Amino acid sequence: MLDIQLLRSNTAAVAERLARRGYDFDTARFDALEERRKSVQVKTEELQASRNSISKQIGALKGQGKHEEAQAAMDQVAQIKTDLEQAAADLEAVQKELDAWLLSIPNLPHEDVPFGKDETENVEVRKVGTPREFDFEIKDHVDLGEPLGLDFEGGAKLSGARFTVMRGQIARLHRALAQFMLDTHTLQHGYTEHYTPYIVDDTTLQGTGQLPKFAEDLFHVTRGGDETKTTQYLIPTAEVTLTNTVADSIIPSEQLPLKLTAHSPCFRSEAGSYGKDTRGLIRQHQFDKVEMVQIVHPEKSYEALEEMVGHAENILKALELPYRVITLCTGDMGFGATKTYDLEVWVPAQNTYREISSCSNCEDFQARRMKARFKDENGKNRLVHTLNGSGLAVGRTLVAVLENHQNADGSINIPAALQPYMGGVAKLEVK
């Protein structure tokens, strides 16, 4: 959530920055809400002053034997109490409307984020690796994976479209990828591994920005009977749980940065994605991902963003996968991000690069929602900056390994870095 004081002091400038990302901030509505708030506050202060003044007179009037005047003053105080209660209710209503609105306003883009309306205007930063030239007719990951244990029909039978069953060799490869990613992040990059819940409350999702704006993208579950029924949600990413581990806390500055990672399933309804990527693993309702989160000092967050991108790149390099890094333009960034890099891996059968990681700096946007703070060197409580990134999406990495390392006979070469996680197996072969 944006800083309300920044909005109040620089309304026009904030509106201009939001317009760069395609958000129309209604300054007239904001000004009207502010006028209502100020009016109620002034009225409240006046009522309180009158109450205090009249209350002081009551004792004196009684002491002078002026009982009727004292009673009249007491009646005035009683009426003022009623008026103050109404003013408090009015102020609460204004504040609720303002708070609800603030929760729907996206973060401000960083000054160096390229301006653009959509993904077509993202900017390529670098390409790493050269796509392989095949001397045979290549297959996509569906045709390669099905003989190795990738079962789309089985997934659809159990749960409907966009669900998959994996068995045998392909299931082992999927597990090996996740373990390799976790080990790389914990042993080489300094992250602490976490295991977190897959079901969370709405306040948790509000903290990281998925609610209230993106409710339709989430799967929810109900718990309890009619009288105690509560709604909870399946996590769309472990970013939600990892980041919220610091909610409502004050972290000693010497403990920063916190570097957290977790392997989890992710659940997304893919609202608005009808007809997109209907074949294969690219877009699923349930998929695994290894997530990276950093909680850092505000002055270190952009340095941390570059570091996090490097951590994701190290996985792709180790798996010998060609990829590119792009900076998302203002019109393509996520709701809570100030700056985002996407890593896109080469997918031979599609003859293009596809997103496999997204690394974002949210600055204090999430921290303000979560009340996540640190105590600085002067003993002052300040909001931390939060960052998140995929390290990587396991299913899409599986797609990339299958397609980039395929052989003419349908076998798959296992990258050397992954072989220890496959029990020394160097090649997957159809049996």
Swiss-Prot record:
Q: Which Pfam families match?
A: Seryl_tRNA_N, tRNA-synt_2b
Per the record, the GO terms for biological process are: selenocysteine biosynthetic process; seryl-tRNA aminoacylation
Does rRNA-binding show up as a keyword for this record? no
Which compartments does it reside in? Cytoplasm
**Which PROSITE patterns does the UniProt record give?**
AA_TRNA_LIGASE_II
Per its record, the protein catalyses: tRNA(Ser) + L-serine + ATP = L-seryl-tRNA(Ser) + AMP + diphosphate + H(+); tRNA(Sec) + L-serine + ATP = L-seryl-tRNA(Sec) + AMP + diphosphate + H(+)
Give the protein's recorded name.
Answer: Serine--tRNA ligase
